[in-house]
Curated annotation (Swiss-Prot):
It catalyses: a quinone + NADH + 5 H(+)(in) = a quinol + NAD(+) + 4 H(+)(out). [4Fe-4S] cluster 2 binds at C74, C103, C106, C109. It is a peripheral membrane protein. Coiled coil: none annotated. The keyword DNA damage does not apply. Its EC number is 7.1.1.-. NCBIfam families: NuoI (TIGR01971), PRK05888.1-4 (NF004538), PRK05888.1-5 (NF004539). [4Fe-4S] cluster 1 binds at C64, C67, C70, C113. NDH-1 shuttles electrons from NADH, via FMN and iron-sulfur (Fe-S) centers, to quinones in the respiratory chain. The immediate electron acceptor for the enzyme in this species is believed to be ubiquinone. Couples the redox reaction to proton translocation (for every two electrons transferred, four hydrogen ions are translocated across the cytoplasmic membrane), and thus conserves the redox energy in a proton gradient. It is found in: Cell inner membrane. This is NADH-quinone oxidoreductase subunit I. It comes from Cupriavidus pinatubonensis (strain JMP 134 / LMG 1197) (Cupriavidus necator (strain JMP 134)). Keywords: 4Fe-4S, Cell inner membrane, Cell membrane, Iron, Iron-sulfur, Membrane, Metal-binding, NAD, Quinone, Repeat, Translocase, Ubiquinone. The lineage of its organism: Bacteria, Pseudomonadati, Pseudomonadota, Betaproteobacteria, Burkholderiales.
Length: 163
């Protein structure tokens, strides 16, 4: 009976409402933690896994040796590779496609590559208006690699002691 009377006065005096308003008031004037993304950017981790790229050797030859380990290890089956044998007996890719609509950005392809040919860059801002815009071919991946090679090489060098 005493508990029922206590509950009645608490509800009559709107105690819970004032407790909630006090909590709201406490955070109303606190420092804001929201980042307004397009204008403000947060620091990106050096190991961030973003857009894929294919790298070249300093002499301009592409690194990929068509071992197809990245295709085999990809859990999302997002990588498609076709290869051909050259006159000197080495294999090179004729087709290297990554479907970013399937990719889960796990980084297994980068870890499996024995020659560091496929890497994930720190690029996080890319979009497509059509589904096909997120289907990257070998030439597109090589262009991304050529454009961001200094950043990729610096990130690989900084991370080398942990690999």
């Amino acid at each position: 009976m005493l508990l029922a009377i206590k509950d009645f006065f608490n509800s009559l005096l709107l105690k819970e409402l004032f407790k909630g308003m006090a909590l709201t008031g406490r955070y109303l004037f606190a420092r804001k933690v929201t980042v307004q993304f397009p204008e403000e950017k947060t620091p990106i981790s050096p190991r961030f896994r973003g857009l894929h790229a294919l790298r070249r050797y300093p002499n301009g030859e592409e690194r990929c040796i068509a071992c197809k380990l990245c295709e085999a290890v990809c859990p999302a089956l997002a990588i498609t590779i076709e290869s051909d044998v050259r006159a000197d007996g080495t294999r090179r890719t004729t087709r290297y496609d990554i479907d970013l609509t399937k990719c889960i950005f796990c980084g297994f392809c980068e870890e499996a590559c024995p020659v560091d040919a496929v890497v994930e860059t720190p690029i996080l801002e890319y979009h497509g208006e059509k589904r096909g815009d997120l289907y990257f071919t070998k030439d597109m991946l090589l262009a991304v690699g050529d454009r961001y090679e200094p950043q990729i090489a610096a990130a690989k060098a900084a991370d080398a002691k942990y690999r």
